[in-house]
């Protein structure tokens, strides 16, 4: 596992994959299957993994957190940067901060929640986490009510933030008042588009952010990598053509659950056995699985 400090070059050199977490039938961590998924992504050019919402870390038992981190360290290639998540609740994040001190992860992300939280309280939680863990935090902005651009900028200016995962969904990503304000207050080099391949072109081209996170990259890592490279080369026609390849699976994720569709898609495509879904979530209805399988396999076929 890569343990060097976070740099702009790191953020821009790889799509930041946000994978599901594979589990055995008894809900224990499936080391071999998680390793298999990581190898698939690594082969496709991915060098940064973010374990967060798609890994359903919202519902992980605090008693399992140390085992999760230990597993990720063991199965990750030496040149791969792993970003675990903490929280979303304050007490959970503080306990996880102590555990993180036992490892060499360069940064960790606080999972967002709107209830019960207030923007000033979120900022305080970030400060406490950084102090207790000894590492900078990834700030995940998923809703405008979570934290203000001004508070986010204060955290950045105080040297507490490694990077920002920006994921507020707008009907038209070109018209994004929050992001427009954020990039005036924070260096766009520290901001990563956090909504997958679909708005990545607009976010990088029009707002100047550094890179993007994605879930469907777990299916077709080489294609998502090609998309990032095309954007960085300003080859917009190629980038748009590649972006279209992800639409079918992304539409299913948006319609039925980004987390659950990806969880099923990885297994149905034959990449790795993701296993059962950890409660409070649950598996999608069987009637949806053929559509997910078709879209996942079609996308995987383009990855060759």
Where do the PLM segments sit?
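Active-site beta->alpha loop and helix N-cap motifs at the rims of alpha/beta catalytic domains
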Residues: 2-147
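C-terminal alpha-helical cap/extension of soluble enzyme domains
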Residues: 2-6, 16-21, 40, 44-45, ...
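A general structural signal for well-ordered alpha-helical segments in protein cores
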Residues: 34, 65, 69, 93, ...
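N-terminal cationic-hydrophobic initiation segments that often serve targeting/anchoring roles
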Residues: 42, 73, 101, 130, ...
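Short Asp/Glu-rich motifs
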Residues: 60-61, 119-120, 149, 175, ...
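Short helix-capping segments at alpha-helix termini
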Residues: 74-80, 103, 133-135, 158-161, ...
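Glycine-rich phosphate-binding "P-loop"
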Residues: 113, 166, 278
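Catalytic alpha/beta core domains of metabolic enzymes, predominantly
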Residues: 143-256
